[in-house]
Amino acid sequence: MNELELIQGLKSGDEASFKYLVDTYQDRIFNTAIGIVQNAEDAEDVAQEVFIQVYRSIHGFKGESKLSTWLYRIATTRSLDLLRSRKSKKRFGFVQRLFGDGNEPLYELPDFNHPGIALDRKENSAKLFKAIAQLPENQKIAFTLHKLEDLSYQEISEVMETSVPAVESLMHRAKQNLRKILEKETD
């Protein structure tokens, strides 16, 4: 099934087209989400939300970009929304603890292994993802899409709605920052 047929099938409510979409893109969407949220359960939730949003809003897809670009954009946005809500909950939890009202522990990121990274040692994988988590938002997105999802700079620029030179700059700064973070940890 080519992309045009898939889009037409999705817009007509064809169940087989939706199943094909999920089967084709679920691993890629999950890998993108886990690269950003760094939690397997949250990444699964994000992936489900992406497909629900596609199901509900496919009629709004104008075809100005590839379907995969649209999916990555939704996955990135949903992942960032989750991180932002998590940060606001952490801030609120800190305020509650200051005033003695918060009895629940703050959410901590568990250790996990990203399915898209094949490293010999789990320790290296954990260090890498800890370092990626410290990157500024746009650098984290560009790095995740390029290194974990193997998207080209052109594809990343479409997902992030920016220019290719901007993506190149983000990748350069992400690599520099990761190098600094990882060097600091080995000292």
Pin down the residues of each PLM region.
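Arg/Lys-rich amphipathic alpha helix in sigma70-family domain 2
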Residues: 59-62, 76-94
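C-terminal flanking helix
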Residues: 26, 30, 51, 136, ...
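Sigma70-family region 2
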Residues: 11-12, 51-66, 85-87
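Short helix-capping/turn signature of helix-turn-helix
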Residues: 24-27, 35-36, 125, 144-151
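DNA-recognition helix of helix-turn-helix
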Residues: 80, 127, 139, 145-148, ...
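Structural recognition of an alpha-helix C-terminal capping motif at a helix-to-coil junction
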Residues: 45-52, 65-77
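Internal acidic/polar
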Residues: 89-118
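Short, charged helix-capping/linker segments at alpha-helix termini
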Residues: 11-20, 30-49, 164, 186-187
